[in-house]
């Protein structure tokens, strides 16, 4: 009895590649018939188990990776860093775009990598995971867009959109993301239909080119072939890379491994031999190819190889041309469909990086390094030669070899971390590049400045276009220009501060426009009569009567609360004694005030709680308050609804707070584990992962099907039938120790909460409560500012308000203030009270900070065109009036004499009493004083301020102020619409000010009055420049923040210097804005706002130096190179572009000057004529192989595998024609005529005057119209033209192709049985014919007998070895 053979058992998962290998082996070992039976059994088993398992795809099967949120946060952080560096001017827009693309592409790839482990861990039998990763349906990219992120998209031009789609299809896309997604998907179904038609037309053209190619011979006798090199680098796609690209080919030479022959010439390569070649062969091998077949219009078996259908040598008569055309054109439809499904997702490769293996110190030589910038704008060094980097950690040492022309991203002796990028290695074969122009738009209006050499472009030598010669910064200095043709009788010089509407004829304030930058006059005007006469002669101004109250406090070492600046209000202002301080936060500036308007609120919270609950009034008494400030204050981006102070506190009393917990859940109702009205103990799970914090009642309110609000009412539950009768009537609060019902006493302050259906089912909940005692302030109104000799025009009083109503439920996540203390105005009606406004000003001097609370009353005056210098000293008021230190009288009744302040700066003539005309004084730094007269009319006031009560405007201005090592940059808000500078002066009358020293106030006794210190105002200069003036609506109630910076003593800066944002100039503090130094004094440094833009070499600047541009103008164009994106959307058009031989933007670097290089090298070896001939052959062969590789890359990027032999057949027909040149003598061809390559070669073997021609690459359409058959050409395109031309030329169609025989109804010259019929007809002609044609003999002599006959063998071998080094394979006879 024979032994039973052992059956092999493979216990492994059979995915798509595994099934592919199984089918291939079955066909190889048992044949097609038996393999089909085995596969039928596999199919039956698969259907059976798929039916039992019941696989279906649902929306819940799409599981998002839990790490996505972390990846998104990290990517957003990197994107914000790139944005900051672009704003600082360290990188330009292109480098920012590259960083952004790199960041989001890496994030997308990490998400894709985490997708498979997440499925395997959480749900290994997930239908999405099984279908995609087994290869049954879909791929990783499509599943990644379902559960990961959509990623970066390409626009219709193929450029990457810098806004990534962070959502996936499971989460859903926003409107913006959907529009971008439509860009990438190329408009969906319509485009898909168009691409499908294009794919069909591509298949028709491909079949048209090669329809006549049939296998006719077994061996054509060719000894030439194409070389395949071993694959060494992962980035270089080579034909030697995998066994699939070797299987089915035929060797052109014998194959040796270590002097042992493992395969002979004309031997086909099977799977085992292919694996051995890949593993052991280190040199290039030569294989047969359709490109080198000697047959004229057909192919031989050896040059074609295996048939892809049967896994054996192709049979004679096989129509391999049609098979090749269809195999290339059919995946074009797949490219189209995948374009629609995946939608233009960016799939670019990240540069190949060299990373550190472990932590340590890097050492390398810096002798041959040259400084440069990486493509992301980081500093880098390029190495001209190979460099060795040594990583050393303690006694461990590791060496890395970096090839030449690589970017080194670290310095020597630098500590590096594990996996840190050390260098970027460039590929040996540079990919195709294209030049792109990036337009840069200005963010500011202003002048263009640059400090590097530029030149005019050669195309526009007389224009304002300039080309940047070296990389540098272009600065836009903030500003605008205002030209006018009117006459203004006024004298001023460059640098003087002027009113903002100085050049306008009328004051036009548009209250409906916000975020509009104001114009200011910046152009320097010379002191010539001609320019002065052209200025405006009449201007209308808005004068504002300003008064102020302020307090001063001391801060040490610049440590103060910047986010909450306070003002201090003292109880009895008339006696100047300090009893109590209240900290108040001012409301936002520019608010129009009326009677009962809140101007400040207390910053000290006494009665606040931190959770939700219910308000219950105790013994307090309230009354409604007629508030004028309860309207909503809105911003552009968000709406803020402030608390409405409705109820004024009348007397002291108590208020109760009953806490509860409120949570909002977004889930289905079934996910909530408790029911409405249930009493739950502490620790009970309410929702997945959420537990009860305390025992209490649960109330559930469903807003929608997915949004539910859960209210947890803490307390103790009492359930008794007699509970309602035993309760004390009309009492709901019980203090600790009081009896609630017989036998139950309150442990804490308790509130009774009754709930139930009726008396029989009443339940009682004992809820904990809090009690607050609120004390009523006994405060009389304060006469803050006497206006026009009176003290009762405006008053400010302290009020306390209850914010919430009795029984109101309060919902808030933060602190809740129950009672608020506010400053309320009390203004009597008068001529100025309707347009009263208030704002605050902070003034810094040494270590004192002065806060001014200013009240403004508007009136309008009209300046006449007259100049006067009369008696201006008598009418001059000063901003800072001084009193004697010994003076203790009431400031309101004090009549102080005017005296000039001995400090530098600008003074202004203020309003005089009892006069109609108002005087205005301008004082420049050279003490040139002019007085202008003005008048006021009621009509102008009504016309210009008709909307003044409905819409409020403020002007935002930057102040740069320094004083004794304190550098302050403050966002300054003022209401003066005309004054461009606010410093040690005001527009109109300022009667008095109070200055309090905070430290001195603490030491004073209660009855002592305060002294006014005159030394505080000595040598005080501060300026406000209006380059950043803006109109804004009242949008927010945020506090005004002040930033302090210290100035070092030795700062070497000059006028006109530019400084970028975050540059450290003053100790360790950084500049908050970029700017140019405009003014320097001993203690002051004024910056003009700027914006830097980095421009690279050869960038184009639109405009001249100091030219004015507006915001949004395109003023720089950066020209840069980028790799051509291997985008899915470009699959089918890219294939069509290659097959039609359309020129690309740039040639690949390995083809540049390739012919000249080969010609030079071979001419040096073999002489000029032979060198020229051989270099032509080699460069043609190289071009053919490069075209095959380019087409393969497009298909391989989509996962489509096409046999190389099919592409080689197509390329063979594209290069089968040559173009005759004008160097020909008298022969049968004209210059520029297309001739068959084989025909030209045979003619040159006979003719004495050889035919001069050059190779040409024809597209498939043009090649289809230049074949041997005019019937085939006429059936393809241009029927009339082709037939007419053929008739004139007398062409004969020998009906050798398939198409022409189909048209005429003849026997198709193809098929496995056609060769027998052909052999039977021509048996007499072909019998015993062994003579060699004279043409073949002549060709062999020319091609291979290059050296003289007496050349020695050793010389032949040396030349042959040299040619092999140049990758040329020839055999000498």
Curated annotation (Swiss-Prot):
It catalyses: RNA(n) + a ribonucleoside 5'-triphosphate = RNA(n+1) + diphosphate. CDD domains: RNAP_beta'_C. Its EC number is 2.7.7.6. It is an enzyme of class 2 (transferase). It is found in: Plastid, Chloroplast. Its cofactor is Zn(2+). Belongs to the RNA polymerase beta' chain family. RpoC2 subfamily. DNA-dependent RNA polymerase catalyzes the transcription of DNA into RNA using the four ribonucleoside triphosphates as substrates. HAMAP family: RNApol_bact_RpoC2. This is DNA-directed RNA polymerase subunit beta''.
